[in-house]
């Protein structure tokens, strides 16, 4: 059984979010939660939220199907970060000039699956 969660337009740069996603790819869901909770990077918070949402989605899916739900059997099957919309801002510079500031956003996707059927 698979469950998926997507967070769109998250205000973290894709490059920084990919660092966090690379840490947890292929790991058990409970282990990934521990890694993200203790990671010092700010990008770990939105990735953790998406992972928790995917686990909750798996719980709901299992309840609907009448299957027993075991969080320890879940692992991260697939996870990736896509680039979202870039917000363009300007900062005033000397002699009437302006410099562009790009505020990048990300779309974070996490897919969790249970071990017995997929691995």
Curated annotation (Swiss-Prot):
At the top level of its lineage, which domain of life is listed?
A: Bacteria
User: InterPro entries recorded for this chain?
Assistant: Ribosomal_uL22, Ribosomal_uL22_bac/chlpt-type, Ribosomal_uL22_bac/org-type, Ribosomal_uL22_CS, Ribosomal_uL22_sf
Q: Which SUPFAM superfamilies match?
A: Ribosomal protein L22 (SSF54843)
GO:BP terms for this protein? translation
Q: Which Gene Ontology terms cover its molecular function?
A: rRNA binding; structural constituent of ribosome
Q: Which UniProt keywords apply?
A: Ribonucleoprotein, Ribosomal protein, RNA-binding, rRNA-binding
For this protein, the record's CDD domains field holds: Ribosomal_L22 (cd00336)
One annotated Gene Ontology cellular component of this protein? cytosolic large ribosomal subunit
Tell me which family the UniProt entry assigns to this protein: Belongs to the universal ribosomal protein uL22 family.
Q: Which HAMAP family match?
A: Ribosomal_uL22_B
What do we know about how this protein assembles, alone or with others?
Answer: Part of the 50S ribosomal subunit.
The UniProt function text for this chain reads: This protein binds specifically to 23S rRNA; its binding is stimulated by other ribosomal proteins, e.g. L4, L17, and L20. It is important during the early stages of 50S assembly. It makes multiple contacts with different domains of the 23S rRNA in the assembled 50S subunit and ribosome. The globular domain of the protein is located near the polypeptide exit tunnel on the outside of the subunit, while an extended beta-hairpin is found that lines the wall of the exit tunnel in the center of the 70S ribosome.
Q: What is this protein called?
A: Large ribosomal subunit protein uL22
Q: Which organism is it from?
A: Bifidobacterium animalis subsp. lactis (strain AD011)
